[in-house]
């Protein structure tokens, strides 16, 4: 099965130019393709995963991806999908973000020791030295104003306002494609569905600049959720690929909590499981949804892909401990991950009567309530129910000397830090 057939099965093709011509080219030779990533933060998030994994899919199929980091365009700002003007970052900030994103991209693509190595590029290398006269004469003259105004990325902003800076973004991205076509023989650009206007503008620039040009564009669908909420966002904010911003446990939990209505689609979109494996999981969703086999497979595949096998094992261990209440088995680093968002309090490492600890740490509102909670068996210290009113929390209750985990009731956790 060819790469395009696989993408069709996975629902990963939104729009494409000259489908027949692209299929023939991909069957005939190893094709260079690119996708751009503007450095708007110091980490990619899961909203970037589809295009990143598309580059990986093409590389696994024998083609040569170019990961383009927008060190130049990142200083301008892409108006696509935005309702208002972006805040411009400083040159130093963009340079820092660029390096961070380049490091992350290297985790997903093979840049050496393969027959079809990926390439990393930074469009600041050619946009940074472009003078205004050359830009207007050699590139700008190829873009009619009516043509640009008709593009969705621009038209959607005309009422709210768009600066010349962001208006010119389409021309700069088009020039990226032309530059990569001329200097790297890059024949295909891929991007999100909101990039269709920019991609077709680039193809038009190539057509006007090069005789007998053969270049192609392909967009991937917008990832949606059945409940109508935005994909990739939680109450805590974006789901980042950087483990310092989103822990592997949080990352794993994001995928594990996928709705039954979305899980098969996400298995197709994001994983490298075979068609047969996905169809089998789809069957399990229909026949035994309570087992959540598809969600577990999705969580495992994605966490392993982004954070590695060891981080996946930790995430599974933390999840199991929180579900069963056996939290004493967790290490200090696992507690940091799993209890990142629970209420916590700093205390000195000294022996304390449990009743006093509950009140002083605001776990129970009063001594009377604390005594009731303990007597009724509602208080757990490191997963163990504690009903003795004179129980003293000592060194033995401090996991690695750093934490004591208090649970009140079935699921209300509190973390004591030392």
Swiss-Prot record:
<dbReference type="GO" id="GO:0005524">
    <property type="term" value="F:ATP binding"/>
</dbReference>
<keyword id="KW-0436">Ligase</keyword>
<dbReference type="InterPro" id="IPR054608">
    <property type="entry name" value="SYY-like_C"/>
</dbReference>
<dbReference type="Pfam" id="PF22421">
    <property type="entry name" value="SYY_C-terminal"/>
</dbReference>
<feature type="binding site">
    <location>
        <position position="169"/>
    </location>
    <ligand>
        <name>L-tyrosine</name>
    </ligand>
</feature>
<dbReference type="InterPro" id="IPR001412">
    <property type="entry name" value="aa-tRNA-synth_I_CS"/>
</dbReference>
<dbReference type="InterPro" id="IPR036986">
    <property type="entry name" value="S4_RNA-bd_sf"/>
</dbReference>
<feature type="binding site">
    <location>
        <position position="233"/>
    </location>
    <ligand>
        <name>ATP</name>
    </ligand>
</feature>
<keyword id="KW-0030">Aminoacyl-tRNA synthetase</keyword>
<feature type="short sequence motif" description="'HIGH' region">
    <location>
        <begin position="39"/>
        <end position="48"/>
    </location>
</feature>
<protein>
    <recommendedName>
        <fullName>Tyrosine--tRNA ligase 1</fullName>
        <ecNumber>6.1.1.1</ecNumber>
    </recommendedName>
</protein>
<dbReference type="InterPro" id="IPR024088">
    <property type="entry name" value="Tyr-tRNA-ligase_bac-type"/>
</dbReference>
<feature type="binding site">
    <location>
        <position position="173"/>
    </location>
    <ligand>
        <name>L-tyrosine</name>
    </ligand>
</feature>
<feature type="binding site">
    <location>
        <position position="34"/>
    </location>
    <ligand>
        <name>L-tyrosine</name>
    </ligand>
</feature>
<dbReference type="InterPro" id="IPR002307">
    <property type="entry name" value="Tyr-tRNA-ligase"/>
</dbReference>
<comment type="function">
    <text>Catalyzes the attachment of tyrosine to tRNA(Tyr) in a two-step reaction: tyrosine is first activated by ATP to form Tyr-AMP and then transferred to the acceptor end of tRNA(Tyr).</text>
</comment>
<keyword id="KW-0067">ATP-binding</keyword>
<keyword id="KW-0648">Protein biosynthesis</keyword>
<keyword id="KW-0547">Nucleotide-binding</keyword>
<comment type="similarity">
    <text>Belongs to the class-I aminoacyl-tRNA synthetase family. TyrS type 1 subfamily.</text>
</comment>
<dbReference type="GO" id="GO:0005829">
    <property type="term" value="C:cytosol"/>
</dbReference>
<dbReference type="InterPro" id="IPR014729">
    <property type="entry name" value="Rossmann-like_a/b/a_fold"/>
</dbReference>
<dbReference type="GO" id="GO:0004831">
    <property type="term" value="F:tyrosine-tRNA ligase activity"/>
</dbReference>
<dbReference type="GO" id="GO:0003723">
    <property type="term" value="F:RNA binding"/>
</dbReference>
<dbReference type="InterPro" id="IPR024107">
    <property type="entry name" value="Tyr-tRNA-ligase_bac_1"/>
</dbReference>
<dbReference type="Pfam" id="PF00579">
    <property type="entry name" value="tRNA-synt_1b"/>
</dbReference>
<comment type="subunit">
    <text>Homodimer.</text>
</comment>
<feature type="short sequence motif" description="'KMSKS' region">
    <location>
        <begin position="230"/>
        <end position="234"/>
    </location>
</feature>
<feature type="domain" description="S4 RNA-binding">
    <location>
        <begin position="352"/>
        <end position="418"/>
    </location>
</feature>
<dbReference type="InterPro" id="IPR002305">
    <property type="entry name" value="aa-tRNA-synth_Ic"/>
</dbReference>
<dbReference type="GO" id="GO:0006437">
    <property type="term" value="P:tyrosyl-tRNA aminoacylation"/>
</dbReference>
<keyword id="KW-0694">RNA-binding</keyword>
<keyword id="KW-0963">Cytoplasm</keyword>
<dbReference type="InterPro" id="IPR002942">
    <property type="entry name" value="S4_RNA-bd"/>
</dbReference>
């Amino acid at each position: 099965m060819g790469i395009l057939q696989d993408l069709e099965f996975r629902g990963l093709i939104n729009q494409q130019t000259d489908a027949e011509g692209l299929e023939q080219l991909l069957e005939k030779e190893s094709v260079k393709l690119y996708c751009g990533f503007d450095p708007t933060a110091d980490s990619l998030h899961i909203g970037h995963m589809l295009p990143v994994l598309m580059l990986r899919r093409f590389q696994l199929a024998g083609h040569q991806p170019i990961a383009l980091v927008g060190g130049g365009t990142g200083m301008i700002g892409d108006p696509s999908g935005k309702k208002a003007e972006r805040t411009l970052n400083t040159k130093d900030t963009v340079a820092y973000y660029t390096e961070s994103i380049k490091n992350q991209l290297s985790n997903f693509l093979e840049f050496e020791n393969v027959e079809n190595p990926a390439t990393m590029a930074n469009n600041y290398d050619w946009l940074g030295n472009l003078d205004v006269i050359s830009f207007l004469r050699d590139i700008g003259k190829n873009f009619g104003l009516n043509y640009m105004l008709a593009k969705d990325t621009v038209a959607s902003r005309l009422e709210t306002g768009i600066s010349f800076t962001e208006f010119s973004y389409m021309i700069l991205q088009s020039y990226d494609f032309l530059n990569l076509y001329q200097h790297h023989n890059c024949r295909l650009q891929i991007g999100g569905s909101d990039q269709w206007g920019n991609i077709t503008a680039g193809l038009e620039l190539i057509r006007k600049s090069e005789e007998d040009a053969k270049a192609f564009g392909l967009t991937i669908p917008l990832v949606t959720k059945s409940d109508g909420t935005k994909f990739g966002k939680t109450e805590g904010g974006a789901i980042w690929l950087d483990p310092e911003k989103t822990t592997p446990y949080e990352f794993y939990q994001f995928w594990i909590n996928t709705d039954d209505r979305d899980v098969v689609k996400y298995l197709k979109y994001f994983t490298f499981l075979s068609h047969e494996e996905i169809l089998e999981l789809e069957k399990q969703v229909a026949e035994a949804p309570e087992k959540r086999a598809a969600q577990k497979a999705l969580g495992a595949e994605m966490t392993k892909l982004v954070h590695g096998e060891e981080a996946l094992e930790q995430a599974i261990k933390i999840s199991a401990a929180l579900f069963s209440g056996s939290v004493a088995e967790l290490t200090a680093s696992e507690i940091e991950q799993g209890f990142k968002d629970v209420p916590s309090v700093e205390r000195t490492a000294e022996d304390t009567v449990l009743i006093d600890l509950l009140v002083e740490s605001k776990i129970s509102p009063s001594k009377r309530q604390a005594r009731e909670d303990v007597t009724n068996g509602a208080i757990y210290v490191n997963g163990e129910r504690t009903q003795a009113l004179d129980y003293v929390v000592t060194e033995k209750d401090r996991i690695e000397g750093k934490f004591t985990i208090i649970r009140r009731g079935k699921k209300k956790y509190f973390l004591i830090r030392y």
